[in-house]
Amino acid sequence: MGLRNRSQLKHKRCFFVTTTCNHWYHIFDSPPFFELISSSINFAAGKYNAEILGYVIMPNHLHFIIIFNEEENQLSNLMRDLKKFTSTHIRRLLQESGKEELLKKLSYQVKRQKYKIWMDGFDDVWLGKREIVETKLKYIHNNPLQPHWALAEKPGDYPYSSAGFYYLERKSDVQLTHYLEYF
């Protein structure tokens, strides 16, 4: 959804959100990156009084389903803060892991910004019915299984997703709330 339409959804509470690494580069390729994204999602959800119903962190993008506990959602503010905070720490992780070639590709000299980790903006889809939430959860959980990714054989095998929480009752690094508590 384009930014100009977000004001129409100010009083909606549940969204499927996608944000992507700049140029679709595969940045998230080791546990420190996944841990950073997981802990950052937890912090942002707590700061904006929201709960995460599902997620997947892929090598070059992430999806999550979020529900806000306030009358007005703060999705744009949450995403701004999440991307700003993670950008700084992702850059540090890239430097520490010696990924100078990738850092060169991410170089970006505009104003005070030296590297561009995330693409501008994000995509969001309002989820108003249980069936739609279930469709998006299925999509999230099957994303790592797609032939072009081949990151897992079964949804619950991929550790950076809510699939283990839903299918195997496994604890997740991202603090999750079961969608049936709301739908």
Annotate each predicted stretch with a short phrase:
Residues M1-F183:
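Short catalytic/metal-binding and nucleic-acid-binding patches
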